Amino acid sequence: AMLSRFGHKLRVAIDGKEYTGTYMMAAICNGGYYGGGYQAAPYAAMDDGLLDIVLVKPISRIQVAGILAKYKAGRHMQDADTIVPEFRSFMTFYRARSVEMQVLDNRPIIATIDGECAPVMELKAEVLPSALNVLLPQPACSSAVIRGQYECPLQAKVR
């Protein structure tokens, strides 16, 4: 979700590697979509043990208006690891097992987790492999099949 129109100075540790910068938005995703159908991480797979992380540096409202539809549709990603050229000057992408964020400007960010919002000064997200069994519909297998990892058992039955 949008952190603020001006951004926040954050220290972000991604699998232990630290980055410091001003960001207006951060999306930490285990699945491809969040609130209202935004496809922040179009290649995310819930079964790969990794989080897909999108960080956005502050841009103008005019720029936001120009790119929002593409971002919502997941067209900011060229492939599973690459941001499209149009977004590269202000957007970065990472894939990791854990991410920690700490606010450095003394103004809390609003974290939204599963639709619940809370002001926080720091947060940590980490994948705990096989900690939870989740029943997914057939399309959930598609990302792993596209990446060639395995054949989805549900798709095999349909053929």
Q: Where are the language model's segments positioned?
A:
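Long C-terminal subdomains/extensions of small-metabolite kinases
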Residues: 1-159
